Amino acid sequence: MEQLTTLPRLGDPGAMEPWALPAWQHWTQGQGCKPGDASASIAATPTALQVKGLRFEESSEPAGAHSPGPIRNTDPEGTETVLPKLGQQAESPGYSCSRLEGEDAQAYKAKFNIGFGDRPNLELLRALGELQQHCTILKEENQMLRKSSFPETEEKVRRLKRKNAELAVIAKRLEERAQKLQETNMRGGEVPLCPDPDPVWSCARKALARQRARDLSETATALLAKDKQNAALQRECRELQARLSLVGKEGPQWLHMRDFDRLLRESQREVLRLQRQIALRNQREPLRPARSQGSTAPSSVGAPAPGAPGETVLEDDVESPQVVLGEPEKQLRVQQLESELCKKRKKCESLEQEARKKQRRCEELELQLRAAQNENARLVEENSRLSGKATEKEQVEWENAELKGQLLGVTQERDSALRKSQGLQSKLESLEQVLEHMRKVAQRRQQLEEEHEQARLSLQEKQEEVRRLQQAQAEAKREHEGAVQLLESTLDSMQARVRELEGQCRSQTERFSLLAQELQAFRLHPGPLDLLTSALGCNALGDHPPPHCCCSSPQPCQGSGPKDLDLPPGSPGRCTPKSSEPALATLTGVPRRTAKKAESLSNSSRSESIHNSPKSCPTPEVDTASEVEELEVDSVSLLPAAPEGHSGGGARIQVFLARYSYNPFEGPNENPEAELPLTAGEYIYIYGNMDEDGFFEGELMDGRRGLVPSNFVERVSDDDLLSTLPRELADSSHSSGPELSFLSGGGGGCSSGGQSSGGRSQPRPEEEATGDELSLSPPPEGLGEPLAVPYPRHITVLKQLAHSVVLAWELPPERVDLRGFHIFVNGELRQALGPGVPPKAVLENMDLRAGPLHVSVQALTSKGSSDPLRCCLAMGAGAGVVPSQLRIHRLTATSAEITWVPGNSNLAHAVYLNGEECPPARPSTYWATFCNLRPGTLYQARVEAQIPSQGPWEPGWERPELRAATLQFTTLPAGLPDAPLDVQAEPGPSPGIVMISWLPVTIDAAGTSNGVRVTGYAVYADGQKIMEVASPTAGSVLVEVSQLQLLQACHEVTVRTMSPHGESTDSIPAPVAPALASACQPARMSCLSPRPSPEVRTPLASVSPGLGYTSLPLRHPVPHGTQDSPASLSTEMSKGPQEEPPVPCSQEEAGSAVHRTSEEKRAMEPTLGQEGPDPVAPFLAKQAVECTSGDAGPTPCSTQEELTQKEPSTEVCHRGDLDSELKLRSEKEGMSELGVHLVNSLVDHSRNSDLSDIQEEEEEEEEEEELGSRPWSFQKQVAGNSIGENGAKPQPDPSCETDSDEEILEQILELPLQRLCSKKLFSIPEEEEEEDEEEGLGKPGPSSSSQDPSQPERALLGLDCESSQPQGPGLCPLSPELSGAREHLEDVLGVVGGNSRRRGGCSPEKLPNRKRPQDPREHCSRLLGNGGPQTSARPVPPRDRGSLPVIEGTRVGQEPGGRGRPGLSRRCPRGPAPESSLVSCLSPKCLEISIEYDSEDEQEVGSGGVSISSSCYPTDGEAWGTAAVGRPRGPVKVNSGSNTYLRLPAWEKGEPERRGRSAIGRTKEPPSRATETGESRGQDNSGRRGPQRRGARVLRTGTTELAPPRSPQEAPSHQDLPLRVFVALFDYDPISMSPNPDAGEEELPFREGQILKVFGDKDADGFYRGESGGRTGYIPCNMVAEVAVDTPTGRQQLLQRGFLPPNVLTQGSGNGPSVYPSAHTPGPPPKPRRSKKVELEDPAQLCPGPPKLIHSAALKTSRPMVAAFDYNPRENSPNMDVEAELPFRAGDVITVFGNMDDDGFYYGELNGQRGLVPSNFLEGPGPEAGGLDSGTSQAESQRTRRRRVQC
């Protein structure tokens, strides 16, 4: 509120100060103040005062007390004037001010006349102005209140207006009176002036006038101020009223309003009184003498009420001045006035002071009032707030009370519920206890019942067994008596037959010498020759059935007859004595010759030498066996091929994997241009053995050739190659012996071929290969269908209506038994179609407008249901081609897999990662894998549907954003590397040494595991570190004697992977005690252990150390019944190791011997004289070394000794062929030392291989020197031969080249091959390759066997025997010690020989078999399948007994031995049980077991080795041959590391009888064909690679792995041979697929599934003599599988039928045909590795390596190729960037651009998607395809394989 001017209290006239007396008395009408005109200022003053007094609406007086109505007043003239209301008055507050200013002159005169002071007037004017302001404010407040519609306020305003009107009337009257008085005064003043113009009077009048004017102006100003103050007060009043109205309550301030009203009225009355006084004074002053009048005037002025009487008096006074006074009176009057004026001035001053005091007091009171009002307002607000809170509090209290009541009730309910719950819980627990008790009682009861039943059954079985035993004993007695009589009666006839066979052997020897010359000429083309030789070697080894085959290991069935083995004629294990005998004779006839290094490279020459060596067949039996072998050259040759592979024949091709990058120009060598630059992870074809400098002769995937440092590469084991076999093959491999043999041979070939082709397994044929799966990566788990289930393609909408759709699709291109289709809509089955229904469907009741619908078609086949997402289509409103549900399916630190739901499965999808284009996802592929990612990195993946260049486009499809979906993901952070697997502690190569082996972790091309770089491995003993190996690929380490003390105190060892970021977790601990016990035991000869039966021992003795198992051919055919069965042999062998664990070689020897026993008889003699034996021998030597190192026992007692023992008598170790200087003990020691040295050297190499080949070579040289210095220097004996055969280089095996081990092995191999060696072994190129490797070990097979089948050799042979062991029970069972020794020897060889194999197999550092001792069966399988060392390329986990793992992560035994061996080793214990292991090896179960237990090497063996195992069966001798051939063709390469295309044994392939032949013969002849076929077959084996054209184009000797080249062998006329029924596993066109020049004329073309007539067994080249379409000719064994027909009627029906459906090929049905799938079932080729080391794991387990992305710019001319196998990069690819590879199914036609890259991959396109395609999974389109020359494409795809073989 604004402060109001303080006014004198009511009834205090003296309180008014002189300044408050306005000059209103001087205002006259003449000045504009007419009667009735209320001066604005005067009117405003009372109004202001009134408003000030009435600050609030309340008043003590009634509303009408002050203003009963409009005030009517009568002016002096009698006119009644109605005063304006307050509202009107306030509208012109400034009117008085302007009016007064207009009358300044008159006011001045009036004031001059009055003489009133300036100061009081100014102050009064100022006070009036303030009042005016207050009035204005009040007016505004009034208006505001009026607007606010406050009725009380409006009423008060009306009252105030009335009061103001009354005051205005009073003021008007006062103004009029003042004017009248003024006029009177002026009239009175004018009268005297005229008569008396006194200058003084004039001056006074002027001064008064001026003073009055000033007073008037001041008074006007004061009035204006008062008006303003009044207005302000009004506004404030209104505000207060509004505020009070808001509060809603009246406060005590209304008491003050009455006071204000009273003060206002008093002030008004005082103003009027003052005005009257002024007027009277003015009247009196002019009249000086009239004092009486002056006194009257004041009295009248003092009248309290301004009434008419007062006005009358004033009028009288006004008229009184008319009296004229005299001069003296004037002066007196003037004086009186002056004195009075002085008094008035003083009085005025006192009044002013009093007014100021009053004003101050008033201000103070106003301040107090304001404070009181503010406080009151605050209290009112506080009160209202507190009242609200009190109300709320009451409400809350009431609610609280109510809630408390509810809470109490709820609490009670809860308590009761808890009590009930507790009671129920207790009851439940009791019931549970009762139930549990009852359950246990029931289980116990059931268990007791089961135990009772079992016990009852067991009792019955025991009783039955007792009866059977009794019967068997009686029958045995009778049979024995009959046999004795029969033998006596037939002795003469047999002698005559022996002489006849000897003659045949001599003739055959001559023929083989010619072949040797031819092969020598072909050595310039080592591939084909190697195939032939290795095939021959493999055949010799592989043909257990042909007992006389020198090349073959001990043959269970000797030439004596089927009696030797109980296997059916068609079974793999069975060999026909006739055929084997001729073959053996032939082999025997061939003189042995030492091979130069080039010769060692040439398997053919080796085989030639084997055949030429008369020693190889020392006995007529051997000659007979050679004759038989002649008939079964294929199988025989196949077997030797594997050993040769081990020996490392020059021409033999192996697949190696570059473990490190190598730039020759940065090395220390003088001729870097002669060396090949290497990139870590790329595949290399290695030809022959390692030279003395530690270099291989190799070829890159792009065709460049040169020297390859051995310590920079590691051999790709057969297991690795076979690990990529198709699932069907894998399954089949486990299913039966024949199948297994097929896998080992054909499969091995396939896998090896696959490896060779680029480390990438080749896809199956179109039927199985669906390109989709390869697009970027295999389908994620749960996504996509199994590879075997075809799916429909190209779904389209034929017609779309409002609520229905007509769909159509294409049937799966694969041959499959369709059982119908399911149509899904949005994942729900909408319609099911039965079989035979057209691929169309009408979907009705579809709401196409509601939104997009996802329609998919699923094929129901005999293989299962296809993946619906592979044939799907989005339709309906909003449907498009954009992929949906893009998500991360699998995420790791370095890889990620994405999946999506394709909008249209017919379209390919481009995949981008961080904006970079990746290989596209082919049509029907909805996943992609990104590899080589950085850990913990954010990536953005984009999948964009690719619109076809031609075809209907929907609007908007041209915009990429409408066709793409994006996804962001962050890779997991890098962690510690993975721990190594399969840690084992095994006896070292010599006493006092323990070998700790493990399976190295899988690393990518950059050498990283789990995102961190692997630097090596640390070995811990009971948690304490004892050793570190600074090699990321090391697979084993030898613990020296100094460290042995530490180990003796510990119980277990663990291995950790080292990296810059720390070490991995501990591996699974391996116990140390057994290894320590064995290592600490002195080496004993297993030969000393109980000897096998004489027959068995004889075969073993027949085995020559150089030959390995090849030299083991049994001199005397051991009939099944007669000879210890493989089981018995295994039993003996197992006994051997148990009794004398230190005799590892004996075990292997036993195995080998047993194996050889059967094959010795058929191939021994020829083998002795030939390189084939040597290759086998090296391999056996390696195995023997392994055994020796493992057992540190009578390793010297080689299988050869065992064979010798078996041959001549029951002596456990008969060194008939070995030099007399080498005694059993010296041989044992030598073998032990050899094994030790070999192992050490190999181990060292493995260690050093990480860094430089030079170091490794140096170490190897040192080791070699050490070996040479050893007391028993096996090297020396073998060195000459091995060097001579291998080419002056003691490189029996690539793995043994530079190492002393290698030299020793070479020397061993150089030792004269025993008669066990079979020429046939070398007839097959693949075998030749293996033989070459073996030659590297003991290439002078003939010489080594002839020189002295030293126990070391026998140990090697034992290894070979192991590999041959599987051949048949007929194998001479090694004594338990022998078997154990062989096992250990195998282990040692696995280490040593394995390394040798590795080296021979082109993996110098790795000991293929080292990781796990290899069974004789393994060796056999390896020898057969891999041709020896080839399998060693990859590290293999220890086999059954856990032989020394590959030191450098390579598998010693398996790779060198080939897959076959690993497979065998899995199934059969490596050494301990000679007979039993042999039997088991021979049996499919054994094979299966081997596969199961083998690591990748084993798996390879399983694929290839299994075939060997099966080939181990003596029945046909073909099993061996087949296995070898199968391998040799491919396996030869496998042996070399690239033999993915090994040919499977005939029986493995489904040709039971082919075994003997398939192993040997097939390898031999097939080498070209087998090579072709094997390669193709290897592909076939691995997945329809069978008709590998490239193989076919390859030289017979081994150039091609497809069809083995045929060696000119004498074959009996087909009319005289038994008729067999075979089925074609692949399409075969001799003209385009065969490497043989006369293929078009001599070989038969056929189609897959075609039924073929086959006469007898396959020849040494791996070819059958058959008939098709009325035409007779040769049929490559690896392209067909035998159909087991039980009855002649069924056979006739089958022949009439002419074809078998694909699904029947792998099935056997009662009397119907039973196909031993060799090519259909084979697993896919080995996993293709791109610049990455492949580990021995299943393809699915291998971590894919980063595939190289190929951009369109790099595309070259395109050509179609056919997928031979199903390929799923996620499952089959070891590379990290599997998304860059295309998944496909067998049979898909893939367009390939340009040439194969260094890693063996093509850049191809399938279904609109592009990516990398492993070459070893492809084959050229068949003749029906009309595309490329079948040979061309296959040759291209299997280029690596062929290279191995060819080169």
Curated annotation (Swiss-Prot):
Q: Which Gene3D superfamilies match?
A: Immunoglobulins, SH3 Domains
Instruction: Tell me yes or no: is Cell membrane among this UniProt entry's keywords.
Output: no
Q: Which UniProt keywords apply?
A: Cytoplasm, Mitochondrion, Repeat, SH3 domain
**GO molecular-function term, one example from the UniProt record:** benzodiazepine receptor binding
Record field: compositional bias (Basic and acidic residues): 1203-1215, 1412-1421, 1546-1578
What segments bear the compositional bias annotation Acidic residues? Answer: 1253-1266, 1296-1305, 1325-1335
Q: Name the tissues where it is expressed.
A: Specifically expressed in brain. High expression level in the limbic system such as the nucleus accumbens, septum, and hippocampus, as well as on the cerebellum and pineal gland. Abundant in the CA1 region of the hippocampus.
* Domain Fibronectin type-III, chain residue ranges per copy: 789-880, 882-974, 979-1077
**Quick one: where is this thing mainly located?**
cytoplasm
Q: Which GO terms describe its biological process?
A: regulation of neurotransmitter secretion
Give me the stretches of Polar residues compositional bias. 1122-1133, 1272-1284
GO cellular component annotations of the record = calyx of Held; cytoplasm; glutamatergic synapse; mitochondrion
Going by the entry's taxonomy, the superkingdom of the source organism is recorded as Eukaryota
Domain named SH3: residues: 651-718, 1617-1685, 1756-1823
Which PROSITE patterns does this one have?
A: FN3 (PS50853), SH3 (PS50002)
Composition bias (Low complexity) maps to: 294-310, 600-613, 1340-1352
Positions of the UniProt region annotated as Disordered: 57-81, 282-318, 560-626, 728-787, 1107-1174, 1191-1215, 1240-1307, 1322-1478, 1514-1616, 1701-1747, 1818-1847
Question: What is its subcellular localisation?
Answer: Cytoplasm; Mitochondrion
Q: What family classification does the UniProt entry report for this protein?
A: Belongs to the RIMBP family.
Role summary: Required for synaptic transmission regulation. It probably controls the recruitement of voltage-gated calcium channels to the presynaptic membrane, and modulates neurotransmitter release.
PANTHER family tied to this protein: PERIPHERAL-TYPE BENZODIAZEPINE RECEPTOR-ASSOCIATED PROTEIN 1, RIM BINDING PROTEIN-RELATED
Q: Report quaternary structure and partners.
A: Interacts with RIMS1 and RIMS2. Interacts with TSPO. Interacts with CACNA1A.
Protein name in the entry: Peripheral-type benzodiazepine receptor-associated protein 1
- State the organism named in the record: Rattus norvegicus
Gene responsible for this protein:
Tspoap1
